[in-house]
């Protein structure tokens, strides 16, 4: 990951585990989440993901996504170019995330907003954060249970169910606001 001296980085590296969305939504998600301060993006093949990529197609997409991340990083004055990692299966993504300090999974059956606020408020300087966002159709119950078993905490993003392309940006914006330093 290319790095330069900058005061534009958040105090905590945030990893976005994004369920593969349809169409070109992933490009938009990458662009906006890089602008908001994400450290790395992990595309994830979940059970309900409509998009199925073979190895050759996946590599081509990842190359394109990294070019988009680089462009967004330059535009927003980032000190790093966040990496878009190769597409992972759900279990691989959970294993990769195991090392992170705080793991969140926005989920419509999560406890109320106060529990989410408390979890976000507990994130402190230097901790690594993983956010799991489902594809269109969300996560299967078994996927949420596997994430919880690995230490991910279900959180709510409010009373509305957000689209896959909105959910990651929403929680990143909340974390950015909480973690921003003068």
What would you call each of these model-derived segments?
Residues 89-94, 111-113, 162:
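A short acidic, often aromatic-flanked loop/helix-cap motif at beta-alpha or helix-coil junctions
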Residues 20, 107, 135, 165-166:
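Conserved residues at beta->alpha junctions
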Residues 1-104:
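RNA substrate-binding interface of SAM-dependent RNA methyltransferases
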Residues 31, 56-58, 118-121, 145-147, ...:
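Short, glycine/charged-enriched secondary-structure capping and boundary segments
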Residues 100-138, 142-143, 152-155:
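Active-site/ligand-binding-proximal alpha/beta "capping" segment
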Residues 25, 89, 138, 166-167:
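Residue-level recognition of oxygen-bearing side chains
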């Amino acid at each position: 990951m290319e790095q330069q001296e900058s005061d534009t980085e958040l105090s905590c590296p945030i990893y976005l585990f994004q369920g593969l969305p349809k169409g070109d939504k992933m490009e938009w998600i990458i662009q906006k989440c890089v602008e908001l301060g994400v450290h790395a993006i992990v595309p994830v093949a979940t059970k309900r993901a409509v998009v199925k990529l073979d190895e050759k197609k996946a590599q081509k997409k990842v190359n394109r996504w990294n070019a988009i991340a680089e462009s967004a990083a330059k535009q927003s004055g980032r000190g790093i170019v966040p990496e878009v990692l190769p597409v992972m299966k759900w279990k691989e993504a959970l294993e990769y995330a195991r090392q992170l300090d705080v793991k969140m999974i926005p989920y419509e059956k999560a406890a109320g907003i106060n529990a989410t606020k408390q979890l976000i408020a507990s994130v402190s300087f230097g901790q690594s954060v993983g956010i799991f966002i489902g594809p269109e159709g969300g996560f299967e119950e078994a996927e949420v249970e596997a994430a919880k078993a690995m230490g991910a905490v279900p959180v709510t993003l409010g009373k509305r169910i957000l689209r896959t392309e909105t959910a990651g940006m929403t929680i990143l914006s909340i974390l950015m606001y909480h973690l921003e330093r003068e």
